[in-house]
């Protein structure tokens, strides 16, 4: 299999051709992907398997006539349509493609292990908003579907807490997502609870680039609860607020707007949650890890919104990273004012 790239940078077109070693002048196009392809049109990537020498080789069918592509289909509106992983079979001689498996639209399934060479039997991870992740043996030839693991939710109080997800609009018109997990036992009409914000700002060129990334949201995922999650606070009467915090500007100059966008993001979220009467804006905390910790300290210094902050493992003096940081590619000597203003 031969890979070719036409063009340069992010817009390069990648093609993969099958070549018979006994007829090297004869090629078959099995895959083509434009660098600027929309996320919703991504054709996937070649599937691989372990070769006879233990290395990774392209997965071909038993008779050698087909290869396989795996990927995830995304949709324009992720709040309506969840991502759906898939597997395609491609005939080498003609390039004809057949979809042999795809995740359901009401739960999230992903291929964990392929059991046989022809991808007729596989182990699939399956989860849903109320379905705890487990593994299933799926046989596409016989239709057999058998559960093989029986894991149970260890924190049902937390994962079962009421959640809300919606868009907020900044004064400049930029829209972003916020997710809120309400305290255990809280019901609409109850007094607004105190809230803990947990965030990690990211940089974007514009609204379109933010929206493109937001399309990967998976509404069919089981609510995750990791070791760094603040959601355990819902058991203590707090709402946990996880806002996107987009820092927006021209490529290479996003941080010119860092303080402005940080303040406006948080203000827009607080105003909207206060309007919905699901937080007490007089009792707010803020926290984050790494760049989220750095941004927590900046928010504590540059905004009046929070009574306390938790900053874990951050770098709070950008002059100590003079050769760039995060998406900032200018050196300290090229953007001195930005580096200093972002060093609380």
Where do the protein language model's features map onto the residues?
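Flexible loop residues that form catalytic
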Residues: 5, 72, 127, 140, ...
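Non-catalytic accessory segments flanking enzyme active sites
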Residues: 3-4, 16, 28-34, 56-59, ...
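A flexible loop/linker signature enriched in serine peptidases of the S9 family
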Residues: 3-24, 35-42, 48-52, 71-86, ...
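C-terminal substrate/ligand-recognition segments
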Residues: 9, 59-60, 69, 74-80, ...
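Signature of short aromatic-glycine-proline-rich micro-motifs recurring in repeat-based ectodomains
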Residues: 43-64, 113-117, 225
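Short beta-strand element of the alpha/beta-hydrolase
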Residues: 190-202
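Active-site-proximal cap/loop segments of hydrolase catalytic domains
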Residues: 208, 212-344
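Active-site/binding-pocket entry motifs
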Residues: 36, 154, 202-205, 316-317
């Amino acid at each position: 299999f031969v890979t070719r790239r036409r063009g340069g940078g992010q817009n390069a077109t990648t093609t993969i051709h099958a070549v018979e070693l006994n007829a090297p002048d004869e090629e078959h196009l099995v895959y083509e992907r434009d660098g600027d392809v929309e996320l919703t049109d991504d054709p996937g990537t070649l599937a691989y398997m372990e070769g006879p020498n233990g290395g990774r080789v392209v997965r071909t069918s038993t008779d050698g006539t087909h290869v396989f592509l795996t990927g995830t289909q995304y949709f324009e509106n992720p709040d309506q349509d969840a991502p759906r992983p898939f597997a395609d079979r491609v005939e080498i001689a003609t390039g004809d493609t057949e979809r042999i498996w795809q995740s359901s639209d009401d739960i999230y399934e992903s291929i964990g292990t392929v059991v046989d060479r022809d991808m007729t039997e596989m182990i699939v991870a399956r989860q849903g908003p109320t379905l705890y992740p487990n593994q299933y043996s799926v046989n596409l030839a016989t239709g057999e579907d058998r559960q093989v693991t029986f894991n149970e939710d260890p924190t049902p109080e937390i994962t079962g807490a009421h959640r809300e997800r919606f868009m907020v609009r900044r004064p400049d018109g930029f829209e972003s997502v916020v997710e809120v997990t309400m305290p255990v036992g809280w019901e609409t009409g109850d007094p607004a609870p105190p809230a803990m914000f947990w965030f990690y700002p990211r940089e974007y060129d514009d609204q379109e680039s933010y929206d493109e990334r937001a399309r990967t949201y998976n509404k069919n995922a089981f609510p995750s609860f990791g070791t760094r999650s603040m959601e355990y606070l819902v058991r203590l009467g707090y709402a946990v607020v996880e806002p996107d915090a987009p820092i927006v500007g021209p490529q290479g100059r996003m941080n010119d707007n860092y303080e402005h966008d940080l303040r406006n993001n948080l203000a827009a979220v607080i105003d909207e949650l206060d309007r919905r009467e699901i937080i007490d804006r007089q009792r707010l905390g803020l926290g984050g890890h790494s760049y989220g910790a750095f941004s927590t300290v900046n928010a504590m210094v540059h905004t009046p919104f929070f009574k306390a902050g938790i900053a874990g493992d951050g770098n709070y003096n950008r002059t100590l990273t003079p050769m760039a940081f995060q998406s900032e590619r200018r050196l300290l000597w090229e953007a001195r004012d930005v580096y200093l203003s972002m060093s609380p």
